Amino acid sequence: SQHEIEDILTIGKEMIEKPIELLDGVEEVLQKLKKNYTLIVATKGDLLDQERKLEKSGLLQYFHHIEVMSEKKEADYQKLIRHLDIQPRELLMVGNSLKSDILPVLKIGASAIHVPFHTTWAHEEVSKKDAHESTFKTVHSITDILRFL
């Protein structure tokens, strides 16, 4: 109905206008890393929406490249590495999802640091066995990654 369509449009508009909330220390970490590393965003989702979020966050200036993927599986990361013309050992992924940020990257020979977030989508959860068979660092705050670099 017309009323339902209006409700959907209102919800969509509210989502777009919702302010971006940065985790503590994110900008400080990006400032430090940008001095010595090429920073890339690798994310899933809609290209325009992800670019808008980065622009709105004020963090776009720190990134050399934005890669918006339909999936984040081994093949997608291999494609990214080819596109960037780098070797897997030159890639360090920092992410909050074991399933899509950490494990596929490790399987292609890259490194990873897991920064758990207090909420994880159900489809992003992995078995303890899968997580423990892999070698990656886990930190509790984004600022902790600076200790490893």
Residue ranges and their predicted role:
Residues 12, 42, 110-112:
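Small side chains
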Residues 13-41, 74:
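Short, acidic loop-to-helix structural element flanking the phosphoryl-transfer center
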Residues 31, 46-149:
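Asp-based, Mg2+/Mn2+-dependent phosphohydrolase catalytic module
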Residues 10, 41, 47-50:
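Short alpha-helical segments used as structural interaction elements across diverse proteins
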Residues 1-14:
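A metal-dependent, Asp-based hydrolase signature
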